[in-house]
């Protein structure tokens, strides 16, 4: 797909394909017994988890990690309980000034080992995907001190009323993300995806001022190194997404792929099956959703995926 060569069929992988929907994952985690923040530091175990979806016939393997992985070496440690909770929220300028830019070969070496291990196991049979959380998504977590889903309006207001704080935090996160993704590519990631998980909650003026510049810097830093996929969850600002330099756009289920294709015929599109249909729909509903999605792209420049990650309640079958 990214080499612009014909493929025999539309390739498919799923966000969060290695995780709690898989009984084998649940069994391994139960036997292991460690909290997630420790599991992510175990390269051998994380490699094993990453490879579980191979038996499903997916066309790519994404490494098993969390979008928050770079935060701990920055000085913003966290634990899973069961969702991630930071040791303390980052809400003061002196806290931002104390954040360090990690040195990936030293501070994130587990990720490098995972990617090397995946390539050693796969021997070129499947591409390996790396990823990172986008700076705004990471900033939301840091300011909230936990999952920000319930208080995004308050976070947006805080960031708008503290522009110097916001600029300094996003600058550190953008530098960290660029270094992190380039390190992943150096260690065997064939493609990388940037996850902005709350983009659908951000007003356009805020998005244009604070989100777009970091997306452009990060994705353009990847040029000629590896393809970059932008997942800006449910984001309606299509022209902004297209201007980032991304090689592919991962779209939510609320966006018509055919309309995107009309406007941007050469873009590689990833998506966009509603993850709730996969979790709650009948086999017929799932088949219909897949056919509709495939019909919209006619199988051209398309990676079949979901609107967001697999939901925990999704039946493994």
Residue ranges and their predicted role:
Residues 27-39, 93-104, 241-242:
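Short, basic, glycine/proline-bearing loop/turn elements
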Residues 1, 23-27, 35, 95, ...:
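Exposed alpha-helical structural elements
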Residues 62-82, 86-104, 188-207, 307-309, ...:
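Glycine-rich, proline-tolerant flexible connector loops at the mouths of alpha/beta enzymes
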Residues 1-80, 216-217, 295, 316:
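N-terminal basic, low-complexity leaders that serve as flexible interaction/assembly modules and, when applicable
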Residues 28, 76-80, 93-98, 143-149, ...:
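Surface-exposed, active-site-proximal loop segments in enzymatic domains
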Residues 2-17, 58-86, 106-150:
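Glycine-rich, aromatic-flanked loop segments that form ligand/cofactor-binding clefts
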Residues 107-317:
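Active-site loop segments of alpha/beta catalytic cores
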């Amino acid at each position: 797909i990214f080499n612009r060569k014909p493929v025999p069929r539309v390739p498919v992988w799923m966000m969060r394909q290695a995780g709690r929907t898989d009984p084998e994952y649940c069994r391994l985690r139960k036997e292991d017994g460690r909290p997630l923040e420790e599991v992510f530091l175990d390269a051998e175990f994380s490699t094993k988890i990453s490879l579980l979806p191979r038996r499903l016939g997916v066309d790519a393997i994404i490494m098993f990690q969390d979008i928050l992985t770079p935060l701990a070496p920055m000085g913003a440690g966290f634990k899973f309980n069961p969702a991630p909770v930071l040791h303390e929220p980052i809400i003061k300028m002196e806290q931002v000034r104390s954040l360090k830019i990690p040195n990936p070969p030293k501070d994130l070496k587990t990720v490098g080992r995972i990617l090397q291990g995946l390539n050693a196991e796969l021997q070129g049979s499947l591409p390996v995907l790396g990823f990172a959380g986008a700076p705004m998504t990471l900033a939301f977590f840091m300011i909230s001190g936990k999952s920000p889903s319930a208080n995004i309006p308050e976070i947006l207001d805080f960031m708008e009323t503290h522009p110097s704080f916001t600029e300094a935090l996003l600058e550190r996160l953008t530098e960290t993300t660029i270094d992190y993704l380039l390190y992943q590519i150096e260690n065997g990631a064939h493609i990388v995806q940037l996850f902005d998980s709350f983009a659908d909650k951000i007003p356009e003026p805020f998005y244009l001022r604070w989100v777009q510049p970091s997306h452009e810097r990060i994705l353009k830093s990847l040029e000629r190194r590896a393809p970059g996929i932008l997942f800006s969850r449910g984001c309606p600002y299509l022209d902004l997404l297209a201007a980032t330099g991304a090689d592919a756009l991962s779209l939510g289920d609320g966006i018509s792929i055919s309309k995107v294709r009309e406007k941007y015929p050469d873009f590689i599109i990833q998506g966009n099956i509603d993850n709730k249909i996969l979790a709650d729909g009948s086999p017929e509903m799932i088949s219909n959703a897949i056919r509709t999605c495939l019909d919209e792209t006619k199988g051209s420049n398309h990676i079949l995926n979901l609107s967001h990650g697999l939901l925990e309640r999704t039946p493994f079958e």
